Amino acid sequence: MSLDVRVIAPNKVIWAKNAEEVILPSQSGMLGILTSHAPLYTALNTGVMKIRNETGWTSIVVMGGFVEVEKNEVLVLVNAGEYVDEIDLSAAKKDVEKALETFNSAEAPKEKEEAAEFLKYAQARLKAVVDK
C-alpha cells in the first residue's frame, strides 16, 4: 500500500504521484507520514519536504502552507515550491542577497513580514542546494 501524494502551489502542481513516505517541515518540527497515518490537518513551515517512492528520495523546498492527511492521501498546499535539483546555486545566493536587501529596506510592518517570509524561503532554497 502506498500514499497518494499531491503537492500543489498556486501556479502549478509540483508532485502528483504515489509515495511510500513523506517528511514535512511542520510548525512543531519535522513530521513523518507513512501509510495508515491517522487523519491530520496542520500548518507547514518554510523548509524542505522529502518524498520517498520506488526511485528514492525527492526533495522539494516549500514556502509554508498546509497539509491534510486522510485515508492514505496526502494533500500539501504550499505558497510556493520547487524541486531542490532544479535550483541553481549561484541564483539561490543572489536571491538571498536580494531578499535580505528587501527585508532591510522594508518599513511598513506588512512589508517587513512579507519580506521576512521571502527571505526565509530564499535561505531555505540556498540551504537545500548546499546540503544536497
Curated annotation (Swiss-Prot):
One of its GO terms (molecular function) is proton-transporting ATP synthase activity, rotational mechanism. It comes from the Eukaryota. The keyword Ligase does not apply. One of its GO terms (cellular component) is proton-transporting ATP synthase complex. It is a peripheral membrane protein. InterPro entries: ATP_synth_F1_dsu/esu, ATP_synth_F1_dsu/esu_N, ATPsynth_dsu/esu_N. Keywords: ATP synthesis, CF(1), Cyanelle, Hydrogen ion transport, Ion transport, Membrane, Plastid, Thylakoid, Transport. It is found in: Plastid, Cyanelle thylakoid membrane. Its main location: plastid. Coiled coil: none annotated. Produces ATP from ADP in the presence of a proton gradient across the membrane. NCBIfam families: ATP_synt_epsi. F-type ATPases have 2 components, CF(1) - the catalytic core - and CF(0) - the membrane proton channel. CF(1) has five subunits: alpha(3), beta(3), gamma(1), delta(1), epsilon(1). CF(0) has three main subunits: a, b and c. Belongs to the ATPase epsilon chain family. This is ATP synthase epsilon chain, cyanelle.
